[in-house]
Structures are given as C-alpha cells and as structure tokens.
Design a protein with these regions (language model features):
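Active-site microenvironments that recognize anionic phosphate/pyrophosphate groups
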Residues: 1-116
Length: 116
C-alpha cells in the first residue's frame, strides 16, 4: 500500500486576517469597526439569538406552554492574534479570559430581565 501525506492549507498560523469580522480594526458584519484591541475583547453579538426586550409573551394551553426570553449575547475574543486558541494560550492569558467570563457573568446577572 502506498500512502501520501498531504498538508492542507489552513490559516492556523495567520496572526491577522483582513477578512475576519473579529480581528482588530476590522469592520464587523453590521459595519461597526472593532477597536485596535491588544487583549481580551468583548462586544454584544451583532446578530444575537436573544434581545434585551423587557416585555414577555406567554403562550399557555393544555398541550404546550411557552414564553419569550430576553437576554444579551456577547462575543468574547480571547486574543487579537487570529490564530490563537484557548488551548494554545499561556496560563496568564487564560486567566485573563476566565476573569472576563466571570465579570461578564456578574454584570449580566445583575440585570433584572436576565435569567442566567
């Protein structure tokens, strides 16, 4: 049997991608420009699955019960380095990400219409 190993062309080593909506200084899908962030960056998701409406609709009959939920969907960019993943980060930078997660949880849980 003859086997040939082929390498696929991936962007794993690309530090900056001009076409990436998450990279620093790039425009996102909604036209907002990201800042030139140097660390963990958080923003509200441009196309969130939930919105922050306070009115609630309830549907209730014998078979089905449903109600609307409000919320905020946030995006956390771990690093300005396009190729960086949590698995490749050092402990200091992983700690920064975890700290941001904690802060986001605390901030969002203070909002009256968030049920996290």
């Amino acid at each position: 049997m003859i086997c040939k190993e082929e390498k696929t062309d991936t962007n794993d080593s690309v530090i900056y991608d001009a076409n990436c909506y998450l990279c620093p200084n790039n425009k996102r899908a909604n036209g907002i420009k990201n800042p030139d962030y140097k660390d963990v960056f958080v923003f509200d998701n441009d196309f969130a699955a939930l919105n922050n409406l306070t009115n609630q609709n309830i549907y209730d009959n014998d078979l089905l019960q449903a109600k609307t939920e409000s919320g905020i969907c946030r995006v956390v960019c771990f690093s300005p380095d396009h190729s960086m993943s949590l698995a490749n980060m050092d402990v200091v930078n992983i700690s920064k990400v975890v700290s941001v997660w904690k802060t986001q949880y605390e901030e969002l849980s203070e909002l009256p219409n968030i049920n996290y």
